[in-house]
């Protein structure tokens, strides 16, 4: 597997900057996506990077989201609907479980309690650290109306600091993404088959097997 990932990273970085802009790497799994993204970044020798905490979606069924035990400490949850004590689209850190309730902490530092059996229309995220450097390609994983960013946007890093990651969108706008809290983004060189649906690209490098690759409808 690692040899296959290295071959794809090599093929991608051998392209001209213009060709890379029009090329999408499609991976079969999140593990493959992580590995290929790291290999591409090493080959590109990006400098001046800083470490940031980002959020990645955790797969959970509707039945699992109704169970308090699903909400492990250090996970982050965002709700798709307003409810008692909770706001739609806000990221809440999981503090712990008390009986049939989950204790969450909002951005204001205040704790709230939620019953998952009643409020299960949600997305779980896990936190992990990545390095981001000027020149990096990132993919936005959650829309932010305030910043003018859309889920799926591919953005190019212009500058990094302890306070923010400044990016340029494909629409040409410059946006400073605050870095004080975990950010909803990931490296954007490789994406999974699921996340690639709806994207268009002039060139596609496929890590996955032919069996799953034929489901792609990109041009």
Residue ranges and their predicted role:
Residues 1-151, 156-158:
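Conserved helicase motor core of P-loop NTPases
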Residues 116-124, 179-188:
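Structured surface patches comprising rigid loops and adjacent beta-strands/short helices at the edges
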Residues 142, 169, 208:
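Pocket-edge structural micro-motifs
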Residues 189-197, 214-219:
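Conserved SF2 helicase motif VI
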């Amino acid at each position: 597997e690692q040899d296959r990932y290295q071959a794809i990273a090599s093929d991608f970085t051998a392209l001209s900057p213009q060709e890379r802009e029009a090329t999408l790497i499609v991976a079969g799994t999140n593990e493959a996506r992580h590995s290929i993204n790291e290999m591409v970044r090493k080959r590109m020798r990006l400098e001046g990077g800083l470490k940031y905490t980002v959020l990645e979606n955790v797969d959970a069924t509707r039945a699992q989201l109704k169970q308090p035990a699903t909400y492990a400490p250090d996970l982050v949850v965002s709700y798709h609907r307003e409810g008692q004590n909770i706001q739609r689209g806000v990221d809440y850190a999981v503090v712990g479980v008390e009986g049939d309730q989950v204790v969450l902490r909002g951005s204001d530092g205040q704790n709230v309690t939620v019953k998952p059996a009643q409020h299960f229309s949600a997305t779980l995220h896990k936190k992990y650290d990545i390095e981001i450097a000027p020149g990096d390609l990132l993919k936005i994983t959650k829309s932010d109306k305030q910043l003018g960013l859309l889920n799926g946007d591919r953005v190019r890093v212009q500058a990094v600091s302890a306070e923010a990651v400044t990016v340029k969108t494909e629409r040409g706008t410059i946006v400073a993404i605050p870095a004080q809290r975990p950010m909803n983004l990931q490296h954007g060189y490789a994406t999974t088959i699921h996340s690639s649906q709806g994207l268009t690209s002039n060139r596609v490098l496929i890590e996955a097997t032919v069996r799953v690759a034929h489901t792609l409808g990109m041009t």
